[in-house]
UniProtKB/Swiss-Prot annotation:
PANTHER family: POLYRIBONUCLEOTIDE NUCLEOTIDYLTRANSFERASE (PTHR11252), POLYRIBONUCLEOTIDE NUCLEOTIDYLTRANSFERASE 1, MITOCHONDRIAL (PTHR11252:SF0)
Biased composition (Basic and acidic residues): 700-710
Family annotation (InterPro entries): ExoRNase_PH_dom1 (IPR001247), ExoRNase_PH_dom2 (IPR015847), ExoRNase_PH_dom2_sf (IPR036345), KH_dom (IPR004087), KH_dom_type_1 (IPR004088), KH_dom_type_1_sf (IPR036612), NA-bd_OB-fold (IPR012340), PNPase (IPR012162)
Organism expressing this protein natively: Streptococcus pyogenes serotype M6 (strain ATCC BAA-946 / MGAS10394)
Residues given in the record as Mg(2+) binding sites: 489, 495
Gene this protein is translated from: pnp
EC number of the protein: 2.7.7.8
Name of the protein in its database record: Polyribonucleotide nucleotidyltransferase
Amino acid sequence: MSKQTFTTTFAGNPLVVEVGQVAKQANGATVVRYGESTVLTAAVMSKKMATGDFFPLQVNYEEKMYAAGKFPGGFMKREGRPSTDATLTARLIDRPIRPMFAEGFRNEVQVTNTVLSYDENASAPMAAMFGSSLALSISDIPFNGPIAGVQVGYIDGEFIINPDKEQMEASLLELTVAGSKEAINMVESGAKELSEDIMLEALLKGHQAIQELIAFQEQIVAVVGKEKAEVELLQVDADLQADIVAKYNAQLQKAVQVEEKKAREAATEAVKEMVKAEYEERYAEDENLATIMRDVAEILEQMEHAEVRRLITEDKIRPDGRKIDEIRPLDAVVDFLPKVHGSGLFTRGQTQALSILTLAPMGETQIIDGLAPEYKKRFLHHYNFPQYSVGETGRYGAAGRREIGHGALGERALEQVLPSLEEFPYAIRLVAEVLESNGSSSQASICAGTLALMAGGVPIKAPVAGIAMGLISDGTNYTVLTDIQGLEDHFGDMDFKVAGTREGITALQMDIKIAGITPQILEEALAQAKKARFEILDVIEATIAEPRPELAPTAPKIDTIKIDVDKIKVVIGKGGETIDKIIAETGVKIDIDDEGNVSIYSSDQAAINRTKEIIAGLVREAKVGEVYHAKVVRIEKFGAFVNLFDKTDALVHISEIAWTRTTNVSDVLEVGEDVDVKVIKIDEKGRVDASMKALIPRPPKPEKKEEKHD
């Protein structure tokens, strides 16, 4: 295929798509130019079905530092593992694409997005999402798209599609919404306590804007799209399925209805193992035993899936016996740990999260150096999910994509209520340790984080709580579930997480397994989530109603002073010599910003006070008319140099020592002598003149003797 170019304009930026020039060995490839951001997307598919029991889709988003005209950091000067932002963007693209493949599709699919040039006012992630959908759509990969995504901002009551950097900084909303022509299938958002009505309108505005991008993709597919490949879908043997269902469906149904998680898992596993043992023995000599046993496992999964959904939609019974809109039992505890700066333990049923607060000087902020201009990140929320939380063994290592994503969601939810830097000049880190999990652990971490912040004395604007909503839909009828547990998440159609305060929503995240959901479902889910959020806030506020007035004794205390900008170099000294000396003497930590704000951190108030004295002395300036108790440091023929304070000396001219004539300075003064002086002049170069005699009453002039005349 020769190069073909397609052009349109979207949200104020040119959108140019090039096909047929690069990456021609991939199943599908595009170059998307949005503004001055350029993203190459290549999609490939394996020739055979993978052996696993899931769809092996991998989406990558690669940030090449040359795209922003930067050298990579580190010794190797080469891009390493993906940044957190790159990982989150890859997840953002994966989530709306994944539901658009057929049930039973098991071929491995890999979509790679490489940012080749970067324009901070034209979203590279949105260009990558567009390119991912288009590369799949024009390829022979059986993708049931297209999909597209946009960012939505909210400024002065107006919604803005794909806001630029300046607009996003002023926006009360940072929403990414994606979907197909028919419906929304992915949401990711942070918001400054916006109402459910505004959030719903933002979602609908975003979906409306998506239509233009989907229509553009359809035009391109009509010109360059390939015929879709015929691939084998995972299908079980119908006779085998009928046999297993007839024999064991009643037993599995009974096991699924056991209310307690571990007991239910044991009951269902016992039925499954019994079935597997029977069929493994029956077909032991069959050469297709592996395929048969794969089908047996899949059939049992489908039976459990069907029973969970039937219970909810027909009997209105949930696996643990709750009502459709009922929250599991709640418990909130503060001060779970000694010594730390704050801690909160939040439990919802069999999901439990422990959040630990750490406060630090602003010098501990994380420096983010990606494609965007370097910036400092003051608030960090980290989420850890050990395997013991679900009673299993597993790998331990660096945080995976899921943990990074859940941490980022909690970060968005909580950062909306943090005090400003001026109100609270600390770097803030929260770590959520999931101790038990049966669904909605990310929302438990938000609730635990609120407890830890308030227990630690961080003056947040309001407590935040989170809840996860679910959905069971057969295409015609649907049921929205409040506070989904693990089984409902696994076999359900939606995981819609909503976090916020009593005033409004601070974060949203939605993933679905079906093609999309309607505005009616969104509205109902948001309304149920609000009711649940208020119930959780009642429990949190009953434990701790407001942030404590003081920090924990172990937290670093802080004091700030303001110095002139031109005095910053005086405090720092050559090569940091002066500030290092102060830190060594007092044991404090010191941060100085470009505006002359000096923050001093220590758990010892006396050390803070001593540091303030030292810095005040360093930046102190002599003033005309002020009196100083000085020390003579040098004597010259023309006068004496005295030290007023720290590194500020003044000259007392010989004529300013006394009202009477001074012949030799050394006859009157000696080095080391303490004297009181008054500053009488400071010249344009900062040189100070002082006087001793100005502090001494001027003696009266001698009276003239009258001449006697004979």
